[in-house]
Amino acid sequence: MDLDLRKVRYFVVLAEELNYRRAAERLYVAQPVLTRQIRSLERDLTAQLFERGRAGTRLTDAGRPARRRRAGRRG
């Protein structure tokens, strides 16, 4: 499966911020664009990566390993 690198970047920034508004600002995109791209990535992977609720956004069990793998690549 070929993943869109833009979607992966959006995932990484959202996983760091855990806030759609701040992540969208960092990425210089509108919040609805970020939301659509994350949902599209979740469909591509057939896994929910984030839980969204009144208490905010957090990584799901499926999203946490992906975030750790990405963090491990930083030098």
Regions found by a protein language model. Name each.
Residues 14-30:
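Short helix-boundary/capping micro-motifs
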Residues 4-7, 31, 56, 63, ...:
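The N-cap/first-turn positions of alpha helices
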Residues 7-14, 66:
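Short alpha-helical "packing" element that flanks the helix-turn-helix/winged-helix DNA-binding module
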Residues 42-59, 64:
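A short LG(V/I)-centered, amphipathic sequence patch enriched
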Residues 13, 25, 39, 43, ...:
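Regular, well-ordered alpha-helical segments
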Residues 4, 16-17, 31, 42:
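Acidic-residue sensor for enzyme active/binding pockets
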